[in-house]
Protein backbone atom coordinates (compact mmCIF):
# COMPACT_ATOMS: atom_id res chain seq x y z
CA UNK A 1 0.00 0.00 0.00
CA UNK A 2 2.86 2.26 0.68
CA UNK A 3 4.10 1.72 -2.80
CA UNK A 4 0.69 2.55 -4.14
CA UNK A 5 0.79 5.81 -2.26
CA UNK A 6 4.21 6.57 -3.70
CA UNK A 7 3.04 5.74 -7.20
CA UNK A 8 -0.09 7.71 -6.59
CA UNK A 9 1.93 10.59 -5.28
CA UNK A 10 4.31 10.42 -8.21
CA UNK A 11 1.44 10.17 -10.60
CA UNK A 12 -0.12 13.13 -8.88
CA UNK A 13 3.11 15.06 -9.16
CA UNK A 14 3.37 14.17 -12.82
CA UNK A 15 -0.21 15.17 -13.35
CA UNK A 16 0.43 18.37 -11.46
CA UNK A 17 3.51 19.04 -13.56
CA UNK A 18 1.66 18.22 -16.76
CA UNK A 19 -1.20 20.44 -15.66
CA UNK A 20 1.25 23.29 -15.00
CA UNK A 21 2.81 22.75 -18.43
CA UNK A 22 -0.64 22.76 -20.03
CA UNK A 23 -1.57 25.93 -18.15
CA UNK A 24 1.68 27.51 -19.30
CA UNK A 25 0.99 26.37 -22.87
CA UNK A 26 -2.58 27.71 -22.62
CA UNK A 27 -1.25 31.05 -21.38
CA UNK A 28 1.22 31.13 -24.30
CA UNK A 29 -1.54 30.30 -26.77
CA UNK A 30 -3.83 32.95 -25.27
CA UNK A 31 -1.01 35.48 -25.61
CA UNK A 32 -0.44 34.34 -29.18
CA UNK A 33 -4.16 34.74 -29.92
CA UNK A 34 -4.11 38.25 -28.43
CA UNK A 35 -1.12 39.14 -30.61
CA UNK A 36 -2.86 37.76 -33.70
CA UNK A 37 -6.08 39.59 -32.86
CA UNK A 38 -4.07 42.82 -32.50
CA UNK A 39 -2.41 42.14 -35.88
CA UNK A 40 -5.84 41.59 -37.44
CA UNK A 41 -7.05 44.90 -35.95
CA UNK A 42 -3.95 46.67 -37.29
CA UNK A 43 -4.36 45.14 -40.76
CA UNK A 44 -8.06 45.97 -40.78
CA UNK A 45 -7.33 49.52 -39.72
CA UNK A 46 -4.61 49.82 -42.36
CA UNK A 47 -6.94 48.42 -45.01
CA UNK A 48 -9.66 50.89 -44.04
CA UNK A 49 -7.17 53.78 -44.30
CA UNK A 50 -6.02 52.52 -47.69
CA UNK A 51 -9.64 52.28 -48.85
CA UNK A 52 -10.31 55.83 -47.64
CA UNK A 53 -7.12 57.05 -49.34
CA UNK A 54 -8.17 55.36 -52.57
CA UNK A 55 -11.66 56.88 -52.40
CA UNK A 56 -10.13 60.31 -51.80
CA UNK A 57 -7.74 59.74 -54.71
CA UNK A 58 -10.65 58.84 -57.02
CA UNK A 59 -12.56 61.96 -55.97
CA UNK A 60 -9.46 64.09 -56.49
CA UNK A 61 -8.90 62.61 -59.97
CA UNK A 62 -12.55 63.26 -60.94
CA UNK A 63 -12.23 66.82 -59.68
CA UNK A 64 -8.97 67.26 -61.60
CA UNK A 65 -10.56 65.90 -64.78
CA UNK A 66 -13.42 68.39 -64.51
CA UNK A 67 -10.90 71.17 -63.90
CA UNK A 68 -8.91 70.16 -66.99
CA UNK A 69 -12.07 70.21 -69.11
CA UNK A 70 -13.04 73.57 -67.65
CA UNK A 71 -9.59 74.99 -68.37
CA UNK A 72 -9.57 73.59 -71.90
CA UNK A 73 -12.90 75.28 -72.58
CA UNK A 74 -11.60 78.48 -71.02
CA UNK A 75 -8.57 78.44 -73.32
CA UNK A 76 -10.79 78.00 -76.39
CA UNK A 77 -13.20 80.71 -75.24
CA UNK A 78 -10.32 83.12 -74.74
CA UNK A 79 -9.17 82.47 -78.30
CA UNK A 80 -12.69 82.95 -79.65
CA UNK A 81 -13.17 86.19 -77.71
CA UNK A 82 -10.78 88.01 -80.06
CA UNK A 83 -12.89 86.94 -83.02
CA UNK A 84 -16.09 87.89 -81.18
CA UNK A 85 -14.78 91.37 -80.39
CA UNK A 86 -13.58 91.85 -83.98
CA UNK A 87 -17.03 90.88 -85.25
CA UNK A 88 -18.61 93.33 -82.83
CA UNK A 89 -16.34 96.13 -84.09
CA UNK A 90 -17.14 95.26 -87.72
CA UNK A 91 -20.87 95.50 -87.01
CA UNK A 92 -20.38 98.87 -85.33
CA UNK A 93 -18.39 100.17 -88.34
CA UNK A 94 -20.54 98.86 -91.19
CA UNK A 95 -19.04 101.14 -93.81
CA UNK A 96 -16.10 98.79 -94.35
CA UNK A 97 -17.90 95.68 -93.18
CA UNK A 98 -17.09 93.34 -96.07
CA UNK A 99 -13.33 93.66 -95.64
CA UNK A 100 -13.68 93.48 -91.87
CA UNK A 101 -15.93 90.43 -92.00
CA UNK A 102 -13.51 88.67 -94.33
CA UNK A 103 -10.65 89.29 -91.90
CA UNK A 104 -12.78 88.05 -89.01
CA UNK A 105 -13.81 84.96 -90.98
CA UNK A 106 -10.17 84.07 -91.73
CA UNK A 107 -9.15 84.68 -88.11
CA UNK A 108 -12.03 82.57 -86.82
CA UNK A 109 -11.27 79.74 -89.29
CA UNK A 110 -7.56 79.83 -88.38
CA UNK A 111 -8.37 79.67 -84.66
CA UNK A 112 -10.60 76.64 -85.16
CA UNK A 113 -8.00 74.96 -87.38
CA UNK A 114 -5.32 75.47 -84.73
CA UNK A 115 -7.63 73.76 -82.24
CA UNK A 116 -7.79 70.68 -84.51
CA UNK A 117 -10.95 71.38 -86.53
CA UNK A 118 -10.99 70.31 -90.18
CA UNK A 119 -13.71 70.17 -92.82
CA UNK A 120 -14.87 66.85 -94.24
CA UNK A 121 -14.62 66.85 -98.05
CA UNK A 122 -17.97 66.11 -99.67
CA UNK A 123 -18.93 67.36 -103.14
CA UNK A 124 -17.54 65.07 -105.85
CA UNK A 125 -16.46 62.48 -103.27
CA UNK A 126 -17.76 58.92 -102.91
CA UNK A 127 -20.55 58.76 -100.31
CA UNK A 128 -19.28 57.40 -96.98
CA UNK A 129 -21.95 56.83 -94.29
CA UNK A 130 -19.29 57.32 -91.59
CA UNK A 131 -18.63 60.86 -92.84
CA UNK A 132 -21.79 61.90 -94.68
CA UNK A 133 -25.53 61.88 -94.08
CA UNK A 134 -27.54 61.54 -97.30
CA UNK A 135 -30.85 63.40 -97.11
CA UNK A 136 -31.56 63.50 -100.86
CA UNK A 137 -30.83 61.32 -103.89
CA UNK A 138 -30.99 62.33 -107.53
CA UNK A 139 -30.21 60.74 -110.89
CA UNK A 140 -27.62 63.04 -112.45
CA UNK A 141 -25.83 62.58 -115.78
CA UNK A 142 -22.67 64.38 -114.66
CA UNK A 143 -21.97 62.04 -111.72
CA UNK A 144 -21.47 58.31 -111.19
CA UNK A 145 -23.67 56.30 -108.85
CA UNK A 146 -22.81 56.91 -105.17
CA UNK A 147 -20.98 60.21 -105.77
CA UNK A 148 -21.99 63.29 -103.77
CA UNK A 149 -23.68 65.86 -106.02
CA UNK A 150 -24.10 68.65 -103.51
CA UNK A 151 -23.10 69.46 -99.94
CA UNK A 152 -26.10 70.94 -98.12
CA UNK A 153 -24.32 71.42 -94.80
CA UNK A 154 -20.59 71.06 -94.13
CA UNK A 155 -19.28 68.34 -91.83
CA UNK A 156 -16.38 68.65 -89.40
CA UNK A 157 -13.73 66.54 -87.73
CA UNK A 158 -12.10 67.57 -84.45
CA UNK A 159 -8.66 65.99 -84.47
CA UNK A 160 -9.57 62.44 -85.59
CA UNK A 161 -13.16 62.37 -84.32
CA UNK A 162 -16.21 63.22 -86.44
CA UNK A 163 -18.17 65.90 -84.58
CA UNK A 164 -20.63 66.78 -87.38
CA UNK A 165 -21.49 64.73 -90.47
CA UNK A 166 -21.78 66.44 -93.86
CA UNK A 167 -25.39 66.59 -95.02
CA UNK A 168 -25.40 65.75 -98.72
CA UNK A 169 -27.33 64.97 -101.90
CA UNK A 170 -26.07 61.76 -103.57
CA UNK A 171 -26.29 60.55 -107.17
CA UNK A 172 -28.39 57.40 -107.47
CA UNK A 173 -28.73 55.91 -110.95
CA UNK A 174 -32.15 54.47 -111.76
UniProtKB/Swiss-Prot annotation:
Keyword vocabulary terms for this entry: Chaperone, Cytoplasm, Stress response
**Entry-linked PROSITE patterns:** GRPE (PS01071)
Judging by the UniProt lineage, the source's domain of life is Archaea
The protein's location, in the record's own words, is:
Cytoplasm
A GO term for molecular function = protein homodimerization activity
Q: Which CDD domains does the record match to this protein?
A: GrpE
Q: Where is the signal peptide?
A: none
Q: Which Pfam families match?
A: GrpE
* Cellular component terms (Gene Ontology): cytoplasm
Q: Which InterPro entries does the entry mention?
A: GrpE (IPR000740), GrpE_coiled_coil (IPR013805), GrpE_head (IPR009012)
Q: Which GO terms describe its biological process?
A: protein folding
Its quaternary structure? Homodimer.
What is the similarity comment for this entry? Belongs to the GrpE family.
Q: What role does this protein play?
A: Participates actively in the response to hyperosmotic and heat shock by preventing the aggregation of stress-denatured proteins, in association with DnaK and GrpE. It is the nucleotide exchange factor for DnaK and may function as a thermosensor. Unfolded proteins bind initially to DnaJ; upon interaction with the DnaJ-bound protein, DnaK hydrolyzes its bound ATP, resulting in the formation of a stable complex. GrpE releases ADP from DnaK; ATP binding to DnaK triggers the release of the substrate protein, thus completing the reaction cycle.
Task: Name the PANTHER family for this protein.
Answer: GRPE PROTEIN, GRPE PROTEIN HOMOLOG, MITOCHONDRIAL
Query: What is the protein name given in its UniProt record?
Result: Protein GrpE
What's the source species' lineage? Archaea, Methanobacteriati, Methanobacteriota, Methanomada group, Methanobacteria
